Each structure stands twice: as C-alpha cells, then as structure tokens.
Amino acid sequence: MALLKMSSILTAKEPPEKEEDKRLMVKCYFYLLSSGISQLNKNGHEEIHEWAKKSPDRVYAWAVNDEPTVSAYIRVKAGKTRAGRGTYKRALPFFTMRFDSLDSALGILMGTADMLEFTKGGQLIMDGAPEFGAQIGAYMMMVGDYAQ
C-alpha cells in the first residue's frame, strides 16, 4: 500500500492539498534526487562521474525551513558518492538547497516554478556558492529526466 501511495505521489501533476501529503511528496523527491545522483555516478554517468572524481570531501543537501524531517543529502568524495536521508550530522554541508516552505519546494521539484525567480523572492535559499546551486540543479534535472 505504501509503495502504491508513493508511486501516485511522484507521478502527480498537481501538488497535493493535504500538508502531510506535501511533506511526503517533498521527502520522496529529495530521496529520489540524492539517490539518483549517487546511482548515476556509481553506474558511470560521464558528467556526474567526472564531477565526483574531482570533488574533495563535500556534502550537498536539500532541506525545507521549519520541517526538520524533510531533508536529504549526498556526500561526494574522490569519485565516490553516498546518498543519505535526513540531516547530515558530522559537519555543516558544503552547499544546501533550502526552501522556505513545502509549497516552494514543490514548485521547483515539480517544475512549475522558476528557480531564479524563487531565489530572488527568497523562497529558495542557496546556502553556499550559487555556482554549486546551478550545478546541483543541472544534476537534479538529469535525475528528473531519467525518472520520467
């Protein structure tokens, strides 16, 4: 039953109405993105593997303000990647893509909002250098393309 619900949530074209469904949907997207980028690296995706090979030990994260259970991360170190759920606890992430609300996160994750406009408006906060936000954003799009 849980897998069926997750499947229907991830294939939805409109954001859900109920707050608990929004929370679940954003969590599923965050887990899909972190795991997807890691799996593309492990399976030899040329662009992502090159990026991971050159990377020092860094953590990239996704989070929503005031939603401590809605977060995920990917650790990248010398060609290896590891996706994780929740907040990375050993150190502050090198870069965090943080959203001001579940609705803002869904706007970006479902492709109905503009990343630059949301950044200007404060709905998307990039903790770290913006060029890394663009890079992670491009990898998010790759995972999204494969997922569809």
Predicted region positions:
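Feature captures hydrophobic
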Residues: 1-148
